[in-house]
């Protein structure tokens, strides 16, 4: 008896119930009044009294299994029927939408090219915080106490220091990174320092209150201004082309001596004069010079033994030069029409 019950249970579990016809055949064979389950219950009276509780339990489990399979099949078939009757919300005949393909921002593209050029010259990359203390941003770079760059009109101060509390500001250049490198490392040093900088300037076609800057520092024995010029010329030729024209002008920076500014022929007018170059025919691309002895001393480097040069350039202005863009504000406005022009 027990073997027959287990065999019937196996048949119930394996019976296919994917159609209404299969479900009806299942009922007729197992669950109706004259079906197999009822017939097995009828034979319970012939079982020995000692075995009746166990066999009765097996029969009840068999009946529950059969009824459960019937109810599950009914629910599944009803759901399938309803889904066929309801119209689909998905119209497979509609044309698909093309996914939007982004591209590298021109500032990041040019900055990456700059890094590659200087990496090939042996420069490594150094970074530092954008929120800086006045000591690193001004004092150790040989800025005079009354230098105009320290004024509120030129610098975004987060907190003005007093007593032992230092000034806290948004860095106006990446030169503080050079200070940190010189304090932490011993010469020879050859690094570039890319990053965002902030200045309290009027926004115009040529200037913005936040921009990207890349500075370089090289300290070694017997470094000369000729080494600096060779580096600048090599960079400019790789960035703007071998026929680029440069102009070095004497200038003043507190942290370099002697100092110079480097101009390149205006990309819009070709040197004839326009509103972008203010009718001069030239555009400034960077400032440079030999590291001031006071800066070296402030960082614990003996200027009698070591010398070096430094330079700094605006990455955004280089983007304007390279792609002939006449307004720096376009780089920060997130106008997708402009950005789509730089797809690879």
From Swiss-Prot:
InterPro entries hit by this protein: aa-tRNA-synth_II, aa-tRNA-synth_II/BPL/LPL, Phe-tRNA-synth_IIc_asu, Phe-tRNA_ligase_II_N, Phe_tRNA_ligase_alpha1_bac, Phenylalanyl-tRNA_Synthase, tRNA-bd_arm
GO cellular component annotations of the record: cytoplasm
Lineage: superkingdom: Bacteria
Record carries keyword Cytoplasm: yes
Enzyme category, top tier: ligase
Known cofactor(s): Mg(2+)
Keyword entries, A-Z: Aminoacyl-tRNA synthetase, ATP-binding, Cytoplasm, Ligase, Magnesium, Metal-binding, Nucleotide-binding, Protein biosynthesis
Molecular-function annotations in GO: ATP binding; magnesium ion binding; phenylalanine-tRNA ligase activity; tRNA binding
EC number(s) recorded for this UniProt protein: 6.1.1.20
SUPFAM superfamilies: Class II aaRS and biotin synthetases, tRNA-binding arm
Protein's cellular compartments: Cytoplasm
Subunit structure: Tetramer of two alpha and two beta subunits.
UniProt name for this protein: Phenylalanine--tRNA ligase alpha subunit
Organism of provenance: Chlorobium chlorochromatii (strain CaD3)
């Amino acid at each position: 008896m027990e073997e027959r019950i287990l065999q019937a249970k196996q048949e119930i579990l394996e019976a296919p119930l994917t159609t209404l016809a299969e479900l009806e055949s299942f009922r007729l064979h197992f669950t109706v009044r004259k079906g197999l389950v009822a017939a097995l219950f009828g034979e319970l009276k012939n079982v020995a009294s000692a075995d009746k509780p166990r066999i009765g339990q097996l029969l009840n489990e068999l009946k529950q299994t059969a009824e459960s399979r019937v109810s599950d099949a009914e629910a599944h078939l009803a759901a399938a029927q309803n889904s066929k009757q309801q119209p689909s919300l998905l119209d497979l005949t509609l044309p698909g939408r093309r996914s939007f393909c982004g591209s590298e921002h021109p500032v990041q593209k040019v900055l990456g090219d700059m890094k590659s050029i200087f990496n090939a010259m042996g420069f490594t990359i150094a970074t530092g915080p954008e929120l800086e203390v006045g000591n690193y941003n001004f004092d150790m770079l040989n800025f005079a106490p009354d230098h105009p760059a320290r004024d509120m009109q030129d610098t975004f101060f987060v907190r003005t220091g007093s007593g032992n509390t230092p000034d806290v500001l948004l860095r106006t250049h990446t030169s503080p990174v050079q200070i940190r490198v010189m304090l932490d490392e011993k010469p020879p040093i050859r690094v570039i320092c890319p990053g965002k900088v902030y200045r309290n300037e009027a926004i115009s076609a040529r200037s913005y209150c936040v921009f990207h800057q890349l500075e370089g520092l090289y300290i070694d024995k017997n470094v000369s201004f000729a080494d600096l010029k060779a580096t600048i010329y090599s960079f400019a030729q790789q960035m703007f082309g071998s026929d680029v024209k440069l102009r070095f002008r004497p200038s003043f920076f507190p942290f370099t001596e002697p100092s110079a500014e480097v101009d390149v022929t205006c990309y819009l007018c070709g040197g004839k004069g326009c509103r972008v170059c203010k009718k001069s025919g030239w555009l400034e691309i960077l400032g440079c010079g030999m590291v001031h002895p006071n800066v070296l001393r402030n960082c614990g480097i003996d200027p009698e033994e070591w010398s070096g040069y430094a330079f700094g350039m605006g990455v955004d202005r280089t983007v304007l030069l390279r792609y002939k863009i006449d307004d720096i504000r376009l780089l920060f406005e997130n106008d997708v029409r402009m950005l789509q022009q730089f797809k690879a």
